[in-house]
Amino acid sequence: MNTIVTSREEILKASRILIQQNGWAAVNIRSVAAACGVSVGSIYNYFDSKTALVSAAVESVWNDIFHHPENGDAFQDTLSCIRWMYQQMEYGCKQYPGFFAHHSLVFIQHGMTGGKEKMHEAWQHILSSLCDVLKNDSHVREDAFNQQFTPEKFAGVLFSLMLSALVRQDFDPSAVLEVVRRTLYEGNSE
């Protein structure tokens, strides 16, 4: 047994690997401790319960999937952002099979409100980023938004389409890109 205390990030990395390999059922204090080569007590130094561990693992997976790229090109305009988001959704489904479809069900079954909160925090971060892109996109027509149709409301529509695509595991953004072009831009050009 490894006597060196592991870090929170190493614990979350081991949790992500367990999720990738065996799904949510594999994440518990004992299995993560074994994967890290540390005692169960070492995990409890960072997480006081399985719920706390799973909640942090959810946040960690969302961060891994939607971590902003270094160069920022994906956030130059709305079309680039949508393309990047759909690429990341596909990456997430490949890296973490069943994550999008099953993790909220896990929280409901086990009463894990902390995990649901982490999921909603991640969603809010995605919505905020999308809204920022909409507000700063130089290609958007001046009259595209008004009091009834705000960047925040359109970000919500785009996010709903994204969640629908996740459920269907359809990572082709072409229809959403066309909606953006027709709704926000002059003509149909990029």
Specify the residue positions occupied by each region the protein language model found.
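Short helix-capping/turn signature of helix-turn-helix
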Residues: 47, 103-112, 164
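Amphipathic alpha-helical packing segments from all-alpha helical-bundle domains
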Residues: 94-95, 111-140, 149-152, 156
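Hydrophobic alpha-helical connector segments
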Residues: 56, 70-95, 151-155, 177
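Short, basic, alpha-helical segments at the C-terminal edge of helix-turn-helix-like DNA-binding modules
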Residues: 59-66
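N-terminal intrinsically disordered/low-complexity leader segments
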Residues: 1-6, 143-145, 190
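Helix-turn-helix
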Residues: 4, 10, 14, 18-52, ...
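Short amphipathic alpha-helix in the helical subdomain of ABC transporter nucleotide-binding domains
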Residues: 4, 126, 147-155, 172-177
